[in-house]
């Protein structure tokens, strides 16, 4: 029995990893080849009214540029409305919005700090647009990115349209370049899922939903961008990813900042998955349940499964001592993660260290996320992720590449 448990602990992360990052993407890719490509609706004679929603907490440094680029997009000026929800900001965020000098830019201040989901809930009664475009305070929207997002929503049966993140940063100084590889893989997988039928989570940086779906309140500890796709599906709509609707997302400059961000976002994501567990029923939700299990559940189960490589070989020390190489590898990886977390800010990590360091920091973040879930912690409030103020990329075109 000891050996059986040991081998089970060792093989579990292998099986989950191969399925989540190999088998599942391959199945979805093959499945997508059997479906016609998702086609945007033609440009309408009259574009619908949009509310661009930004929930911000102490974003005085970056918010003005984000609003500037949002208002400069290729879209009729009289059809744009920007609503900034301040989560009881204590810096100059509120004054910046009040003094912006454009009647299309409005401020809704939360009297007490409750977090981004609470701000999104509060915005429901204040939106003016037929569609609500949610963006982060730190991202920039290229000029030609908004119309493709709207054209996707004009396709009958589509309730949510998600943009395509382009991860950008200071190539010479940052310590987290490996993040861009993961983001690229994630966006490609969403493109396959769109062709099959529906994505299971939107990009929190840039997505749009029908006003009636956005107005539905959600528990304040959930991740709305993840939950929004399931809300759309449960109301008979599909959620799609739009390749031409790009947004420029500055990478977190250090793996230390990435650890904080990932543990928080994954913790909220796990709580959201528990809340949405009914969506995993294949008899009711069909392909959506399959993709939810493959894209989200399998990935997030992988993190606690990695603990098996610390314990399993110890149970097999007599019958299969060679498996201790896995324990040694995990310990070495955790030491590497510790090294990357103490790397001086502003100095670029060597390529030999950056990618494995990112992987092991992500594993630690996953463990912390599960710990948050098991302890019943509800991660509603947040601190702005320390991203670069300036992006070394042009926002004039969506053709930028990570």
Regions found by a protein language model. Give the residues of each.
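N-terminal membrane-anchoring/stem segments of glycan-assembly enzymes
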Residues: 1-44
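Membrane-embedded multi-pass helical conduit in multi-pass membrane proteins
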Residues: 2-3, 30, 35, 42-44, ...
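Cell-envelope/extracellular polymer assembly enzymes that use nucleotide-activated donors
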Residues: 48-51, 81, 227
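Short, acidic, metal-binding catalytic loop of nucleotide-sugar glycosyltransferases
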Residues: 68-79
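A conserved acidic beta->alpha catalytic loop
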Residues: 76, 86-95, 112, 139
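Catalytic donor/gating beta->alpha subdomain of glycosyltransferases that bind UDP-sugars
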Residues: 102, 153-186, 219-224, 228-293, ...
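Glycine-rich, basic loop-to-helix element that forms the pyrophosphate-binding segment
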Residues: 110-127, 147, 184, 227
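Short aromatic/hydrophobic "clamp" motif used to bind/position activated sugar donors
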Residues: 132
